[in-house]
Design a protein with these regions (language model features):
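An exposed, glycine/acidic-rich loop-and-rim segment of catalytic or binding clefts
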Residues: 2-361
């Protein structure tokens, strides 16, 4: 059974104390979570040559705040919403009304403000529960929301996140975690040697503003095909393909084969990331219809991050469980709508292991 301890992490610019909660299991896996933004600060995985911290991040509270309040916020390790990913022209309609959101990513709305909230915490057994509210009108969204994020670390080295939301008005919800994974143990170098597997026959192409076009395309015969695992470096620089050229890497949603008839099968692997250096693997499971794969295309800015390291471009991979981007404006896609009396429920699990590559390790 996992143990949970805590320690002070820092103070926000508004004077609020921030606490770091550390979950550890008997096998040596350790996960650190902050009550600011529900940030995953560290995931330390035992490996043959010693423990490896497999997520990017910052050393201080001030660094996280400077990042998250900048125009180029990375949301590094954070819980994001109300609507993870982009909403076209920062507008959508629900309940017969049209809502204008903050346009914080060019003309579009991206992610929202949940990464900048302070959460109330309860710890019991091997579980950490973080709760907060989102008032009606926050970022322009309707409805008063009650948020609950539950973190669980199991003895088989699975780290699971469960999200639950209720609303008192018709609204939309799409939540995810924005951790940046580098399984190599050296985030001072590119991570494109990591292997990726995606259980997905289709993806949603995006335009030059990273907005989904409304199409669903087959991955067959394109650099988007990860049904047979391969190193990212084999395809990430293929600028003859417009999707990679526009994004300077991968920043796309894949339509998971594990989601059928309106339900996700979280007993089946939807994605695997693996390092040929440390032999650390990550197997992902979710009930969501999509996964956003982002390869750190906007990293390499020269900003010093965790341990003073300046991360290069393509140093990491985000695997973000989600509804498809801009689903509120794409009526044929899986629904992001939430009504009063209903419960939004989403979860994702990352299972860590070591050894040679395998899909069902």
């Amino acid at each position: 059974m996992a143990q949970i301890r805590s320690k002070p992490f820092g103070v926000t610019k508004q004077g609020a104390n921030v606490t770091e909660y550390i979950l550890s299991n008997p096998g040596g896996l350790t996960v650190s979570v902050l009550d600011y933004g529900c940030i995953i600060k560290n995931i330390i995985v035992p490996a043959k040559n010693g423990p490896v911290d497999v997520v990017l991040g910052h050393d201080t509270m001030a660094d996280y705040e400077d990042d998250f309040t900048s125009s180029g916020s990375t949301c590094c390790g954070a819980f994001v919403g109300r609507y993870a990913n982009r909403i076209e022209n920062a507008t959508f309609s629900v309940g017969g009304k049209t809502y204008q959101l903050e346009a914080n990513n060019g003309p579009n709305h991206l992610h929202g403000c949940f990464s900048r909230k302070l959460y109330r915490v309860k710890a019991f057994g091997d579980t950490l529960l973080m709760e907060a509210e989102s008032p009606d009108g926050e970022d322009g969204f309707p409805g008063n929301l009650k948020l609950a994020v539950r973190y669980t670390l199991t003895e088989d080295n699975t780290f699971r996140m469960d999200y639950r939301v209720s609303s008192d008005a018709d609204t939309i919800v799409n939540l995810t975690n924005h951790s940046y994974f580098n399984l190599n143990g050296d985030p001072s170098k590119e991570g494109t040697n990591m292997w990726l597997y995606l259980n997905a026959d289709n993806y949603t192409p995006a335009d030059s503003t990273y907005m989904t076009t409304g199409e669903i395309r087959s991955v067959e015969g394109t650099p988007m095909d990860f049904r047979k695992a391969h190193a990212l470096e084999e395809t990430i620089n293929d600028t003859s393909f417009d999707q990679i050229r526009n994004a300077t890497g991968y920043d796309h949603n894949w339509c998971l084969n594990t989601y059928k008839n309106g339900k996700g099968d979280d007993t089946k692997v939807c994605a695997v990331l693996w390092s040929p250096v440390t032999k650390i693997g990550l197997s992902m499971y979710t009930n969501e219809p999509g996964v956003q794969v982002y390869t750190g295309n906007f990293q390499g800015t020269g900003v010093s991050c965790k341990h003073g390291i300046k991360y290069p471009k393509h140093v990491s991979v985000c695997l973000e469980s989600q509804k498809y981007p801009d689903s509120p404006n794409k009526p044929n896609w899986p629904s992001p709508y939430l009504k009063p009396g209903e419960k939004y429920y989403s979860h994702v699990a990352y299972r860590f292991w070591t050894g040679e590559f395998g899909i069902d390790k």
